[in-house]
C-alpha cells in the first residue's frame, strides 16, 4: 500500500544553499520532517545549478518521511541571467532595461519545456517572451 500523504510544501530556494534557517526550517518543522536530511539532499542535487533559484515541491508522508521534486528555475531568473541584469524594470512599459535575442529565448524555452504547459517550443518561447516584456526586457526580432 502507498504511503499516506500528510502535506505538500512548495518552496523556492537558492541552489545548493538550503539551510535550516527560515524559510526552510519553519515550513518543514511544522510537518515534522527531518530538516537537515532535506537540506543535505537538496544541496547535493542542486550543487551544479549554483546561483539559480530552484522551485521545489516537497511531499510529506504520514511516517514523517518525504520526497521532493525539483522544477526548472523561474523564467524571470533565467532571463535576468541571460541578459546580465540584477532586477527587472520598475515600470516595464516605459523603462526598458535590456534586450534579449530570439536564440536566448529559445534556449530558455527549451530549458523550461518540462514545466510549461506548452505544446511546442514556439508556444513556450511566446510565454517566455511575455515574461521578458513584463520585466522591461525588449525582445529583438
From Swiss-Prot:
Transmembrane segments: none annotated. GO terms for cellular component: cytosolic large ribosomal subunit. Keywords: Methylation, Ribonucleoprotein, Ribosomal protein, RNA-binding, rRNA-binding. GO terms for biological process: translation. Pfam families: Ribosomal_L11, Ribosomal_L11_N. InterPro entries: Ribosomal_uL11, Ribosomal_uL11_bac-typ, Ribosomal_uL11_C, Ribosomal_uL11_C_sf, Ribosomal_uL11_N, Ribosomal_uL11_N_sf. One or more lysine residues are methylated. One of its GO terms (molecular function) is large ribosomal subunit rRNA binding. HAMAP family: Ribosomal_uL11. Part of the ribosomal stalk of the 50S ribosomal subunit. Interacts with L10 and the large rRNA to form the base of the stalk. L10 forms an elongated spine to which L12 dimers bind in a sequential fashion forming a multimeric L10(L12)X complex. Belongs to the universal ribosomal protein uL11 family. NCBIfam families: L11_bact. Forms part of the ribosomal stalk which helps the ribosome interact with GTP-bound translation factors. This is Large ribosomal subunit protein uL11.
Amino acid at each position: 500500500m502507498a504511503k499516506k500523504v500528510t502535506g505538500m510544501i512548495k518552496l523556492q530556494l537558492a541552489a545548493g544553499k538550503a539551510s535550516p534557517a527560515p524559510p526552510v526550517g519553519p515550513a518543514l518543522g511544522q510537518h515534522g520532517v527531518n530538516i537537515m536530511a532535506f537540506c543535505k539532499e537538496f544541496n547535493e542535487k542542486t550543487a551544479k545549478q549554483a546561483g539559480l533559484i530552484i522551485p521545489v515541491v516537497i511531499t510529506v508522508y504520514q511516517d514523517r518521511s518525504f520526497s521532493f521534486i525539483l522544477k526548472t528555475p523561474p523564467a524571470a531568473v533565467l532571463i535576468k541571467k541571460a541578459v546580465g541584469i540584477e532586477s527587472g524594470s520598475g515600470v516595464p512599459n516605459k523603462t526598458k532595461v535590456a534586450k534579449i535575442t530570439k536564440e536566448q529565448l529559445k534556449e530558455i524555452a527549451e530549458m523550461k519545456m518540462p514545466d510549461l504547459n506548452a505544446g511546442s517550443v514556439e508556444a513556450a518561447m511566446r510565454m517566455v517572451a511575455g515574461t521578458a516584456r513584463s520585466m522591461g526586457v525588449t525582445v529583438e526580432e
